[in-house]
């Protein structure tokens, strides 16, 4: 696991709303689950394929994990460890954003 950065997948509109408010509060799934779902760099493709297949207008946010005080790594139902954040985060924690273009087969170009 790389503890320096975690990655958040969200829609462009969710990210634009966060930039307007200077804070990211989470996606509808995050809000329902009570924490913000992240992936490490090796989990991004798996997360995209499992939850975002055929979904256009997505962005991938590279987030400085060292700035996230309430970040914990928890075991998922698959047995893998995933980073979860039990708070909002300031958009200044995002060090890079990537547009995730949708390919014809429904997967995303990273």
Regions found by a protein language model. Give the residues of each.
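Conserved, structured core segments of small domains
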Residues: 2-110
């Amino acid at each position: 696991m790389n503890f320096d950065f975690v990655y958040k997948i969200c829609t462009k509109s969710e990210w634009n709303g966060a930039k307007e408010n200077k804070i990211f509060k989470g996606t509808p799934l995050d809000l329902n689950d009570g924490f913000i779902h992240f992936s490490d760099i090796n989990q991004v493709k798996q997360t995209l394929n499992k939850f975002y297949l055929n979904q256009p207008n997505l962005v991938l946010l590279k987030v400085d994990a060292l700035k996230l005080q309430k970040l914990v790594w928890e075991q998922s139902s698959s047995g893998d460890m995933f980073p979860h954040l039990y708070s909002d985060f300031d958009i200044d924690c995002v060090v890079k954003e990537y547009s995730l273009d949708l390919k014809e087969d429904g997967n995303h170009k990273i």
